[in-house]
Amino acid sequence: MSAGLASARPGKGALTHTARRVIRLNYGFQLLFNLLWWMPVFYAYQKEAGLSDGQIFGIQSIYYVAFCLFEIPTGLIADRIGTRNCLRAGAVVMTAANLAPVASASYTGFLVHFLAIALGRSLTSGAASAYLYDGLRAEKCDEHYLKAEGTARALGLAAKVVCWPLVGPLMALAHAAPYVLSAASAAGSLACAVALPRLAGTGQEPGRAAGRRGGAFLRDAGSALRCVASSPWLALVMVQGVAVFTLSRICQVNLFQPILLHHGVGEASHGSVLAAMTVAEAVGSARPQWLSRRLSPVAWVSILSLALAGTLAAMTLGGPWAVVALLCLFAAATGFAYPVQRKLMNDAVPADAPRATLLSIESIVDRAVCALAAVAVGAYVAAGHLDALLWHSALATVVLLGAVQLLLRSGVATAARTSVSGTGGPAARPARPGGTPADEPAPPGTAHSPARRRP
C-alpha cells in the first residue's frame, strides 16, 4: 500500500502523472484555442468581401460591448457546469465561430463570427486558469502553477510567430485558409478539453454551489463598486491603465492592417510583421526588470503610454520600413507597460476588497472604452483621415495622462493611497487576508485564486 501511494504521488516538488497530464493538455488547449490564423489579414479579408470601413469597425465595437456583457453571465455558467465543461463549450463555440465567415463572407457572417468569438473567449478566459490551478492543487503540485501558466503563454506566442508568416502564402492557395485553419485549431483545443481528467478532491459541486456563488458575486460586485467610488487612488490607476490598453488594442488589432496598407506594405507581409511585433512584445513582457527603479511604477506607466502615443504620431512621417520598425517599438513598449500596470493595479486594491471582481471591473472598463474608440476609428478611416486619427489619438493620450498627473500631484489621491499602502510609499504592499502580499500568489483555497482573472 505504501509503495503504491509513493509511486502515485511523488515527494514534494515532483509532478504526479495526473499533474503532468493536466499541464500538457492545458498547453495544448491554450495554444490551439488562441491560435487565430486570420488575425494578420482579417481587415483586408473583410474589405475584399465588400464591407466598408464603417461596417468593419462597427463590428469591432459590437465585439467589445458583447465581451463586456458576456463577462458576468459566463462566470456564473462556469460555476454551474464546472470549468472542464466550460472549456469544452468554449471550444465548440470557437470552432463554429471561425467557420462563420467561410459559410457567409458577408456583414452578417462576420458579425456572427465576432459575437461567437466574444462568447467563446468569455467562456474560457477564466475557466482555463481555474482548472489548471485546481488540478495542480488537487495533486499537491500547486507550486508549479506559475511556471505552467508562463510556459503556456510562451508556447502560444511561439506558435503565432511560426504560423502567422505563413498566412499570406496559404491565402494564395486557398482564400479562406486562415479561417479554416483557425477552426481546425479550435477543434484541436476541443480534443484537449475532452481529454482533460476529472479533478479529484477539489470539492466542486457546480450545480449546488451555483446559487451560493451567484449571491457571493453580487455582494462582491457591490463591494467593488463602492471601493472604486471611495478610493480616488484606485480610480486614477484604472484610468491610467485605460490609456495603455486602448492604445495597444486599437493599434495592434484594429489599425495594424490599415496602417500597413496605407504605407504600401502588401497583405502577404502582414503575418511576418505581426510575428515580429509579437516577439517584441514578448521580450518586453518578460523583462520588466529592465526598467529603472529610480522612477515609480506610476511614472513608468505614464512614460510608456507617452512613448506609445509618440510612436503613433511618428508613423505618419515615415516610410514602409520605418513604420514596421515603429510598430515593433510600439509592441515592445506595450510589453513593458502591461506587467507594470498589472502590479500597480494589484497594489492599489485595498486588502479587504474583492480583488478578482475589481480586476474584472478594470477589464470591463478597458473594453468599454475600446468599443467607443472603435466607432471613432471607423469614422476616421472611412473618411480617409488615418494620419489625423493617429495624431489625435496621441494628443488625447497626452491630455489624459496630463490630467492624471495633475490630480496625483495635487494630493487628491494621497489620502486614499496612504490608506491602501499603509505608508504611502511605493515599496509598501497591501496584504491579502492572512498577511500575504498582493504581488505574491494567494494561498490555495483563498478567495483570490485566478478563477476569473484574464491574463
Question: What spans do the regions from the language model cover?
Answer:
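Helix-loop junctions on the cytosolic side of multi-pass membrane transporters
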Residues: 180-211, 406-418
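Juxtamembrane intracellular "pre-TM" segments in multi-pass secondary transporters
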Residues: 2-20, 198-239
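C-terminal transmembrane bundle of multi-pass solute transporters/carriers
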Residues: 59-60, 68-72, 79, 84-85, ...
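Cytoplasmic helix-loop-helix junction between adjacent transmembrane helices
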Residues: 115-157
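Conserved MFS/SLC helix-loop-helix module at the cytosolic interface between two early adjacent transmembrane helices
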Residues: 67-105
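Paired small-residue
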Residues: 108-117, 322-329
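Helix-loop boundary and gating motifs at the non-cytosolic
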Residues: 11-69, 231-275
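C-terminal ends and interior cores of transmembrane alpha-helices
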Residues: 92-106, 306-319
